[in-house]
């Protein structure tokens, strides 16, 4: 068959599809048409040489904030994503029932990146980094409106978002979690995502009200009541049991939620994140310490998480949670031709966590080319 484009000679890595090794990828009509050791016998309108590069599915970031101009967090989606190999992301509760239409307008008119969104339990959504908690005042909670928004926006809204932490909720008990879970049930049993950093109460008291498929985000924060309790030495048995039961643990780096000592201890004890994400905002994308998803992936690579598992947790795993399994996050024939090409650069790279600690990594992932629906949307300038 004739391809629109063939990506040749790259080191393909897609653990979910069982692909690893030097392969060519043929693209036609915006879809993956063929993956084989060689497609040299097939005509193509364009060929891109990927020799010496890693070729992965387009990255999927399940936790970011992209409601631009609505608060001080939202970043320019396409600018942030293209240069980092991300082709799909999920906005994690920036908007609630009262302003979700505004988020949709921004995405429909200004954004090419594929986006899904969690709807905040608070009607007003996240107001920013310095204006207090969106659920510190109980009347802002809008379970009926949140559920209705999810039901009325099936192409965009995928679940309920709750931020549980100091100053973020109206009371420090499990009641906000119970309300968020009931809201998710009202919306048809969609997942809820819960922010847990610096929780005022122990984590087991919260996760006991979650269901399989729900998401605990910021699982590697180093503050109060995390996955290792107050001693911060050993994983809580309730956390291990919750993950085994199907609760999703997402790392979501962010400004305050990614601690190297917690990561090292958790990985040493066999606790891997189910998904790798950024919690990216305009500030953390431009001033650090997050920068982008490949940087977060590189930090986990430094601590010994195998590259194949990093790719799985940054592509197929979040795609499945977002209801996009088989469409994105995969290089299987028939999937959208979302492809990221990376250089695994060697050197000495100083990387920082959310609490100011640094590591010197020997390897770092750098996006070389990003393709969405078969079209190149980013190429790294030569010599950079």
Locations of regions flagged by a protein language model:
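Histidine-rich, glycine-flanked metal-binding segment
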Residues: 1-56
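Divalent metal-coordination and catalytic microenvironments
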Residues: 10, 25, 30, 52, ...
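C-terminal cap of metal-dependent C-N hydrolases
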Residues: 10, 336-384
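Metal-associated gating/positioning segment near the N- to mid-region
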Residues: 41-42, 47-110
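Short, acidic/polar
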Residues: 70-80, 139-150, 200-206
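Metal-cofactor-binding active-site regions of metalloenzymes
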Residues: 84-90, 94-95, 110-138, 161-165
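Active-site core of metal-dependent hydrolases
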Residues: 162-287
């Amino acid at each position: 068959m004739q391809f629109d484009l063939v990506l040749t000679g790259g080191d393909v890595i897609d653990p979910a599809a069982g692909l690893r090794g030097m392969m060519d990828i043929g693209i036609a009509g915006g879809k993956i048409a063929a993956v084989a050791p060689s497609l040299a016998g097939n005509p193509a309108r364009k060929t891109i040489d990927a020799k010496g590069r890693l070729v992965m599915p387009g990255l999927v970031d399940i936790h970011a904030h992209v409601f631009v101009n609505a608060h001080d967090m939202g970043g320019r989606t396409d600018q942030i994503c293209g240069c980092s190999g991300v082709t799909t992301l999920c906005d994690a509760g920036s908007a609630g029932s009262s302003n979700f239409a505004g988020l949709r307008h921004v995405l429909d008119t200004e954004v090419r990146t594929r986006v899904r969104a969690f709807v905040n339990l608070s009607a007003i959504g996240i107001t920013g980094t310095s204006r207090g908690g969106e659920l510190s005042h109980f009347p802002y909670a809008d379970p009926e409106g949140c559920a209705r928004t999810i039901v009325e926006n099936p192409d965009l809204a995928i679940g309920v978002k709750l931020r549980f932490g100091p100053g973020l909720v109206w009371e420090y008990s499990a009641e906000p979690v119970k309300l968020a879970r009931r809201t998710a049930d009202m919306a048809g049993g969609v997942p809820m995502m819960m922010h847990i950093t610096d929780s005022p109460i122990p984590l087991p008291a919260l996760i006991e009200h979650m269901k399989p498929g729900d998401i605990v985000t910021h699982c590697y924060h180093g503050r109060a009541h995390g996955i290792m309790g107050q001693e911060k030495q050993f994983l809580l048995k309730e956390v291990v049991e919750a993950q085994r039961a199907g609760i999703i643990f997402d790392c979501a780096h962010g400004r305050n939620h990614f601690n190297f000592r917690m990561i090292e201890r958790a990985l040493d004890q066999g606790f891997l994140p189910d998904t790798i994400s950024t919690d990216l905002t305009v500030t953390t994308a431009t001033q650090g310490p997050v920068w982008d998803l490949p940087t977060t992936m590189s930090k986990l690579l430094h601590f010994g998480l195998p590259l194949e598992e990093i790719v799985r947790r940054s592509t197929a795993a979040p795609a499945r949670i977002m209801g996009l399994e088989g469409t994105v996050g995969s290089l299987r024939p028939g999937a959208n031709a979302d492809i990221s090409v990376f250089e695994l650069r060697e050197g000495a790279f100083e990387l920082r966590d959310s609490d100011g600690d640094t590591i010197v990594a020997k390897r770092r992932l750098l996006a070389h080319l990003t393709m969405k629906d078969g079209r190149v949307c980013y190429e790294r300038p030569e010599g950079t």
